A protein has these predicted regions:
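Regulatory alphaC helix of protein kinase catalytic domains
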Residues: 8-18
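Periplasmic alpha-helical coiled-coil/stalk elements that build and connect Gram-negative outer-membrane
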Residues: 12, 40, 138-254, 353-356, ...
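Amphipathic alpha-helical coiled-coil scaffold segments and their short linker/junction regions
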Residues: 18-22, 73-91, 187, 226-290, ...
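A short glycine-centered flexible hinge/capping loop motif at secondary-structure junctions
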Residues: 182-186, 385-389, 426
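Alpha-helical heptad-repeat coiled-coil segments that mediate oligomerization/polymerization in large
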Residues: 188, 346, 353, 388-392
Length: 447
């Protein structure tokens, strides 16, 4: 049976890759699972406001029945009234507890006052939900950055391979021209050898570019959490020329960065921890009740049901409450200091990434102008060589110079794309990436 060749994976656009990464990345899925966990914990915390009702069946076996024996009193009564026949006076005894007892009690307990601890627990649960939500946003930003690096890294590797292939094809044609001119006696043997050496080096670089493509493809598959081969990226590299000033990105970072949102949630969480520890100094007041469902084994002195109000006051705990309160206040101080540092770090990070994007954009613009000169130089050197007035080395140098400009131009575009993704992550605006990529002020970069 002949094996059919494996089907080529379909081309992959960046929006498709982003949807796949957000749907399959384990770190992001774990962050979303934590949000669901915190949501359920928030619902569970609301149950603290309600009474708890429990059912605890008990079977007890005693060594004997427990009796209430009042016969000594009966004897005294008979002595005081000798005219009464003893047979007419029943025994003064009763069974309080049988040897075998089955109890089916329903018990209830309802907190009435806890010093604010239940409210603090609910507000803390809400803060944990917000913390998990901000963490998920942070994970989404990280997935976008990783995908940009991997997706456009593969695109860059494919473009570089295409450039290397064109250079190799051009040098192979140059070798053929050199051999023909050598046979015609128009150039020396050394000129043909120079062309063949350059062709061999171009072939080596082309093979190396092929390996780089496979490495980049494996990296993209890892980001997409895909065990299958991934298709070639069809979204080209780009450079956006309509970025707003750096101050706008800095303001956005300080207003809505998910790391700051996490610290805000943790600040609230620390505040609720302080409130809960203060509440521990107050008495706990609760209502309680009991109802016995099996009444046959009840003793004459036991009620079928009871209800009441109780209180619990912690008189001494070895200073534990004071230390826990101090720890909660220290946590508040810690979060406040972390917030100050993060705001300063975000401002610096935004400024650095903005400058990186500007540098890459300027490099691209300069190389775009240089590319036309390199193309014209190669045409002139090739024409001069074919006419016998130029050397093979000049043609090779011109072609390699053209290749260098083309590759550096692609690398500058890739550097811009990466810097843009990191700038948007630093400012908490990862969701703007697609909008900037397709904006009117953006140009697509091809070899």
């Amino acid at each position: 049976m002949a094996w059919l060749p494996a089907a080529e994976p379909p081309p992959l656009s960046f929006p498709e890759a982003l949807a796949a990464a957000r749907g399959g990345n384990e770190s992001l899925l774990a962050a979303r699972a934590e949000v669901r966990q915190r949501e359920e914990e928030k619902k569970a915390a609301k149950g603290l406001y309600f009474p708890t009702v429990s059912f605890a069946p008990l079977y007890t076996h005693l060594n004997d029945d427990i009796l209430l024996d009042l016969n000594p009193i009966r004897d005294v009564v008979l002595k005081l009234h000798p005219q009464v026949p003893p047979a007419l006076v029943p025994p003064f005894e009763d069974t309080l507890f049988k040897q075998d007892m089955l109890r089916l009690p329903l018990t209830a307990r309802w907190p009435l006052f806890t010093g604010g601890r239940i409210g603090a627990a609910n507000r803390a649960a809400e803060a944990r939900v917000r913390d998990a939500g901000a963490q998920t946003r942070q994970a989404e930003e990280g997935v976008l950055r990783s995908l940009v690096r991997a997706y456009f890294g593969l695109r860059l590797a494919l473009e570089e391979k295409a450039v290397r292939a064109e250079v190799l094809a051009g040098l192979e044609q140059h070798v053929r021209d050199a051999r023909r001119l050598e046979e015609e006696g128009l150039i020396a043997k050394v000129e043909r050898l120079n062309a063949e050496v350059a062709r061999a080096e171009a072939e080596r670089q082309f093979k190396r570019a092929g390996h780089d493509v496979e490495i980049a493809r494996a990296g993209l598959a890892n980001v997409l959490a895909s065990d299958a081969a991934v298709g070639d990226p069809v979204t080209p590299l780009f450079v956006a020329f309509d970025l707003e000033p750096a101050d706008r990105f800095r303001e956005a970072a300080l207003a809505s960065h998910p790391a700051l949102e996490r610290l805000a949630a943790q600040r609230d969480l620390a505040g609720e921890a302080v409130a809960a520890q203060k509440g521990a100094f107050w008495p706990e007041v609760f209502a309680y009740g009991l109802y016995e469902m099996r009444k046959t084994d009840l003793s004459p002195i036991e009620p079928e049901w009871l209800a009441g109000v109780g209180a619990r006051i912690e008189l001494f705990d070895g200073g534990s409450r004071l230390k826990k309160l101090a720890a909660a206040r220290a946590q508040q101080d810690r979060v406040k200091l972390l917030d100050q540092k993060l705001r300063r770090d975000l401002g610096t990070l935004v400024e650095r990434q903005y400058r990186e994007a500007e540098k890459a954009r300027e490099q691209y613009a300069a190389l775009e102008a240089t590319r036309a000169l390199a193309d014209e130089s190669l045409r002139a050197r090739t024409r001069a060589f074919e006419e016998g007035v130029g050397t093979s080395l000049e043609v090779v140098d011109a072609r390699l110079a053209q290749e260098k400009v083309r590759l550096e131009r692609l690398a500058a575009a890739y550097g811009f794309v990466n810097a843009l993704a990191e700038l948007l992550e630093a400012s908490g605006q990862g969701d703007r990436f697609e909008g900037l990529r397709t904006s009117p002020g953006t140009i697509e970069v091809r070899p």
